[in-house]
Amino acid sequence: MKKIRKGQYGYRDANKKKRITYVALFAVTIAIVLVSRFFVPMEDIKNLMMITAILLVLPAANLASPLLVAWKYKTTPKEFYDAVKPYEDKFTVFYDLIITNTDLIMPVDSAVIHPTGIYLFCPNKSVDVKKAEKFINEILVGWKLDGNAKIMVEKKNYLNRLASLRDLTEEDDDGSVEYITKVILGLSM
């Protein structure tokens, strides 16, 4: 089975399944350690087993917290993926991202990186678009890149914008696309 990486179609669901598996394994391990305490006669070892169980909770919680944040976001609908897929040959395209900061949880079904800007489609109409654009642009400027991210919440507008983008030429490539790629994937969980 091929591993689905961050930014590839199907990442949200694959990542969710992987995290559920890890959290379940931790929960079973913690339960085994706690139950086995009752079969050990020495008090010192019982205490060590209790400490072990408590310490196992920390990585389990570390895996569970992003899972809880991303729980309600499913993989991008196949129809939308099929509509954006033709642009993969022309531009750098990412799917199934969830961009977060302390004030923002924004699902991004598709992100296209182009020298004229970063174009993101967010299906959640309740996201404060101006605030989200400001956050992403500040991060880009902090990395000495052009802060020109555009977030669209209307599917039709997003697809029209992609259709209007001109093809990349060698003169357009200033090398910033790979840096922007790292930044956008770094912002996503």
Predicted regions and their residues:
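Surface-exposed interaction regions that form or flank ligand-binding interfaces
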Residues: 1-94, 101, 134, 143-144, ...
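Membrane-proximal soluble helical/coiled-coil segments
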Residues: 90-158
